[in-house]
Regions:
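N-terminal Lys/Arg-enriched interaction segments
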Residues: 1-132
Length: 132
């Protein structure tokens, strides 16, 4: 019994220290809840008539997730933060998650214009240029 307690304590300490090694302020960090199915806004973009409210809601959600840089162009694959293969891979992963969130917050009838864009920034720019 004492051995099991010692093992559990050591496992918990190990897990805690590995979690502390993540920089939660790093825009490349993805929390477990930040998966492709996460919802950015309750109202999908349907067109010009709700673009302003939709865009504001999406921006606020992304600010809360520390991911606004993926749509405003400040966090790109060529930015100074991407200085290693690991960072580049993390950027690709995070950018694809953000792109998926945006696609999932848009009415399916509008998917044709954005589905083949490569980055979240390209998707955002296409929607902004089309509807704002």
């Amino acid at each position: 019994m004492a051995d099991a307690t010692a093992t559990n304590t050591s496992t918990t300490e190990s897990s805690s220290s590995s979690q502390e090694s993540y920089n939660l302020n790093d825009p490349l960090f993805l929390h477990l809840g930040e998966n492709p199915g996460a919802v950015l806004t309750s109202q999908p973009l349907v067109g010009e008539e709700n673009y302003s409210a939709w865009a504001r809601s999406v921006r606020k959600s992304l600010i809360g997730k520390n991911k606004l840089g993926f749509i405003d162009g400040s966090i790109t694959i060529s930015s100074p933060l991407m200085n290693s293969p690991t960072a580049i891979q993390a950027w690709i992963h995070a950018d694809n998650i953000v792109a998926t969130w945006i696609i999932n917050s848009v009415s399916p009838k509008l998917h044709g214009s954005i589905i083949y864009r490569d980055t979240a920034f390209e998707i955002w720019t296409e929607l902004r240029d089309t509807f704002s």
